Structure formats: C-alpha cells, structure tokens
C-alpha cells in the first residue's frame, strides 16, 4: 500500500532525525513481532494519518518551508513512483489545502532579515538531524555578534541546551 511504502521511505529520515543508534535495529533473524514493533516505534502509521496532530505543520511546509523528498533509489523495483509522487499534498494535507502552492517569500524574508540584521538569538541544531541541512547554520560563517549558532556534535532533533556539551552550554547560557 502507499502508506506502507511511505513508512519504509520515512524510516531512514526518522532514524537520523531522532539520532537512533544503529545498535537498536533488530537483527535480521529477529522474530516478526520484534521487527514490526521496532518499525512502528520508529515511524508509526499515524504520521500519515488524516487529521494528524501536526497537520498544520504540513500545510505550512507545503506553503512556506518546503519539505524533504525520499530517496527511492534503493527501493525502485518495489515502489510505484506514481503512488509516491505528490504524496505530501495527497496524503498529509486536508482536502481544502490540496491546491496550495509553494511561496518562498517568507523564506526570503527570513533569510534577508538574518543577512541584514544581528538580533540577539540562539539557534540550536543536532549534527545528524536531517533538518539541520535546511537550517540557517550558514549564520556561523557571518561576522555576527549576537546571532549564535550551535550544532550539537552527534546530536539529533533532540538537541537542547540541557544536553549540549558543557562548553557549548556555557556559551549558550552566557548569551542568554
């Protein structure tokens, strides 16, 4: 089914996003229940359910942020590309938003704002979180006095002030 295919494709993103240790992946000879339980824990089907708790994020992603695609190459012979194409609008958006078009004006506004200004701000990212790639980590390379970008080594989507390395945590607290 399309949802199952999407879950298989989502798995690799989820694994990196949440910093899941490879050692937690069940062995190939594990029983079916162990494998299915692990798979559902990593990327449950509720992510692709109608009226999802993060539905508003999906609307904003389609309209303002953009959204990641999937690497289907390893699964090419198993996945129907037509089922996957346009899945975000077809599967994750309420029908009334099906015709929403991407508008990069908010993205450009934010980028211009950070380029032209130096607000007192702390940005925290995890090194292995795929979302870090779309962050404004490029601010580290600018001569900004007030904008500080911290990338937690080995960190995931769970990167927080409390779990930063001590030296970074001290810099963050000093900035606050």
Give the residues covered by each predicted segment.
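Alpha/beta-hydrolase fold active-site neighborhood
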Residues: 1-105
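Conserved alpha/beta-hydrolase "acid-adjacent" motif
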Residues: 72-73, 130-135
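The feature captures the conserved acid-bearing segment of alpha/beta-hydrolase catalytic domains
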Residues: 105-116
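Short beta-strand/loop motif that positions the catalytic acidic residue
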Residues: 117, 123-125
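Conserved beta-strand scaffold positions in the cores of enzyme catalytic domains, especially
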Residues: 123, 146-151
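Solvent-exposed loop/turn segments at secondary-structure junctions
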Residues: 128-130, 156
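Short, solvent-exposed amphipathic alpha-helical segments in soluble enzyme
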Residues: 138-142
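Catalytic active-site module of serine/aspartate enzymes centered on a nucleophile-bearing elbow/loop
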Residues: 151-176
């Amino acid at each position: 089914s399309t949802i199952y295919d999407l879950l298989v494709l989502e798995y690799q993103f989820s694994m990196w996003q949440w910093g899941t240790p490879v050692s937690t992946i069940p062995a190939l000879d594990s029983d079916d229940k162990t494998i299915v339980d692990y798979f559902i824990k990593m990327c449950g089907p509720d992510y692709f359910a109608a009226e999802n708790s993060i539905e508003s994020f999906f609307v904003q992603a389609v309209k303002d942020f953009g959204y990641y695609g999937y690497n289907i190459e390893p699964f090419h012979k198993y996945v129907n590309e037509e089922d996957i194409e346009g899945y975000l609008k077809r599967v994750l958006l309420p029908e009334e938003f099906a015709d929403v078009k991407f508008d990069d004006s908010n993205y450009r506004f934010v980028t211009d704002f950070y380029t032209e200004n130096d607000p007192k701000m702390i940005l925290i990212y995890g090194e292995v979180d795929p979302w870090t790639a779309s962050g404004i980590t490029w601010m580290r390379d600018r001569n900004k006095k007030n904008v500080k970008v911290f990338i937690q080594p080995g960190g995931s989507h769970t990167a927080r002030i409390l779990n930063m390395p001590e030296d970074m945590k001290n810099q963050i607290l000093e900035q606050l």
